Amino acid sequence: MSGHSKWATIKRKKAATDQKRGNLFTKLVKEITIAAKMGGADPGGNPRLRLAIDTARSNSMPMENILRAVKKGTGELEGVTYDEITYEGYGPAGIALIIETATDNRNRTVADIRHIMSRNNGSLGESGSVSWMFHRKGSLDVSKSAVSEDMLLEILLDAGLEDLESDDAIYYTVITDLKDLETVKKALDAAAIPFENARIDMIPENYIELEAEDASKVIRIIDALENNDDVQAVYSNMEISEKAMNSLNE
C-alpha cells in the first residue's frame, strides 16, 4: 500500500540506526552452526547454510568466524548445542508476534521472553495462537534505482516470484516460495541486478495499521526481544502510515 510501511520496511529502517553488530554476530554464528549441524558443511547442498553464510559475509563477519561456526555445527570443533524454539504471542495494540529463538537453556529463554513481553504490555500465547496468520517465505530487497518495476517483474515471473511489494521509497521487496529463493537470486545475478538482505521471512496474511503512539510501543517490545541473545528473529503484522513513521524518526 503506497504511503505505508510494512514490517519488512520498518525492520530495514530500524537496522539502519541500530548499533548492535556484536549482538548480530552472535545471532549469525548460531544460525550458521545450526544450519551446518542440520544439513552438513557444504553450502552447495545446504541452502540454509548458504543463506546464513551470505548474510554473515554481507555484514562483514570475518571468514575465520564463519568457518569456526560451521565446524562447531558439524562437530569438528567442540561447541554449544542449540535448540530452536518458536514462541508466539501478542504485543501492544493486538499486534501478532512470532519470536524465533536458538538456546542452550530452554528455561532461561522462556522466562526471559515472558518477562520482556509482560513488561511491555505483551503476552505469550500457546503454540499456533498466531502462526496461522503468517506464511514462511523467501524474500530479498532490490534497489529501485537499479531496475524498473516492469523489468523486475519480467525477469522474475518465471523464476518463482510470488509477490512484489513496492511501498518502500527505496526498495522493492521480492517475495518467493522458500524453494524458489535461490532460483530468484540466480535470475537477478544473471541480469546483473544487485540485491540485498536475502532471507527467510514470515509474511502475514493481513497487516494491522498503527499510528505513531501504538507503533512506538510495538517497536519498543520488539527491540527488547531482539536485544536478547537467545532471540534470532521477531516477526509482526504491524503496518505504519508514512506520516506516523516520519514522526517516529523525529
From Swiss-Prot:
It is found in: Cytoplasm. Keywords: Cytoplasm, DNA-binding, Transcription, Transcription regulation. InterPro entries: Integrase-like_N, TACO1_YebC-like_2nd/3rd_dom, TACO1_YebC_N, Transcrip_reg_TACO1-like, Transcrip_reg_TACO1-like_dom3, YebC-like. It holds the Pfam family TACO1_YebC_N. Its main location: cytoplasm. One of its GO terms (biological process) is regulation of DNA-templated transcription. The keyword Transcription regulation applies. One of its GO terms (molecular function) is DNA binding. The keyword Cytoplasm applies. One of its GO terms (cellular component) is cytosol. Belongs to the TACO1 family. HAMAP family: Transcrip_reg_TACO1 (MF_00693). This is Probable transcriptional regulatory protein Cpha266_0538.
